[in-house]
C-alpha cells in the first residue's frame, strides 16, 4: 500500500440544504488508501451528528488530521500542521469563535498523550481502532475534557459506525474503497503497522457484503478491498465453510452493478491457491497486483523478517502470470536496510529486472522507533542510500514508461470516472490502474467503454473510443 503521499480528502459530500447553524468539519488525510477510507467513515459518523464537510479549514468548526506513521518525518509533518492550526485557533479566539482540533490515525495511536504534551492546542487524539467513538469523544471535548482514545476497542468498530448516506456515497464517485481487514501479524522488523493498527482482524462476510451492496446501490462500479495484509482475510462464508480472500472476491462479484474488483496490499506469504484461481477465473478481478517484496536479497529479507526468499517470490509471480498472462505487478522496495551490502543491493536490482514491474514505490530505510530494525547496528551511510535509491528508481521508472508504451495500440475497456480538464474530455481507469484520457461527449461517469490507446501522457494513456 503506498504510504508517502499527503493529500486532502473531503470528509463527506456536502448536504444539499445544510441547516444555518450546522457545524462544519475539515479532514486532512495523510498516507495510504485505508486512511482515505477511515476519513470517510469518520465523516459518516459525524454526518449523523449534524456535521457537514468543508474543503478548507478556514470555516471549519472541527479540524481532524488523519495521520500516517510509516515514514520517518510523519510526526514532524503533524506538528508543523498543528503549529499552523494553533495560529488559526488564536485568531478565532480573538474574534470570540472556537476551533476544535483533533488528531486521528497512526501517529495518534503511536504517540497518544505525547501529542497533547507537545501541542496543548489539540483537543482530541483518537486511534484507528477507536474512531467509531468519535461522536462521544467530541461530546466530552465540548464538556471541557482533553480526550485521548487509543486503547484497542473490545467492540467491533464497524458494528458501531453508521452506514453512509446514499447521496454522500454517490458524490464520492464510481470507484470506492472497502476495508475488509486490518492489522498485521507479520512483524517485519522495519514496520510500525503491528504497533499502530494491531493484530490481524477480518471483518465478517455479512458486514462486507452489506457495505458493498450499499456502495453498488449508490452507483459504485469498482471496489478496491483494503487491508494492511488484505490477503490474510478469512472468515466464515455464507455456506458455512472457512473462506479466504479468493472466495470473498467471487461473492462480491455477484453483486449487481459491481463491474470491477481490486485489492491491496498483499503479502507474498498469503497468496493462496484460491486467490490465484480468482485471478484466473474471475473476469471482474482486474489484472493488476500490488505485491511488495522490499528486497531481492535473501539475507536482507531474513533480517527484515519477511518469511520468504527471493526465489519463492519469483516463483509466485510466475504462477500468477501463468494463470493471468496480462497481469501487471507493482511493489515496494526499501534500500539501505541495516547491513545491506553492495551485493545485497545488486540482488534487488536483479529481482526488479526479473519481475519487470509496471509500477513500484521505493524508499530509503529510516528507523522507526519501537521496531526491531531501530535497534540494529551496521547502518548504511546516507550517501550510499541516496546513490542506491537513485539507481533503483531509474530502473523502476524505465520499466514503468516501457509498460505505458506497451499499451499503445491495445484495445481495452475503460471505466469513466470524471470529466477531464478540457471541454468534452473524460478521464477513465484502465484495467491496469492507469488513468485514460478520452475525448468523449456522449458517455457518462460510470459507463464502461471500449477504447484504443493511441499515445501516452505523463503517467496516463490517451485513447480513442471505438464503436
UniProtKB/Swiss-Prot annotation:
Q: Tell me the function of this protein.
A: Catalyzes the methylthiolation of N6-(dimethylallyl)adenosine (i(6)A), leading to the formation of 2-methylthio-N6-(dimethylallyl)adenosine (ms(2)i(6)A) at position 37 in tRNAs that read codons beginning with uridine.
> Could you tell me what this protein is called?
tRNA-2-methylthio-N(6)-dimethylallyladenosine synthase
- Please classify the protein's predominant subcellular localization into one broad category: cytoplasm
Recorded GO terms, molecular function? 4 iron, 4 sulfur cluster binding; metal ion binding; N6-isopentenyladenosine methylthiotransferase activity
Q: Which residues form the Radical SAM core domain?
A: 170-402
Location in the cell reads:
Cytoplasm
Q: Has the keyword Repressor been applied to this entry?
A: no
Protein keywords: 4Fe-4S, Cytoplasm, Iron, Iron-sulfur, Metal-binding, S-adenosyl-L-methionine, Transferase, tRNA processing
Q: Which organism is it from?
A: Brucella abortus (strain 2308)
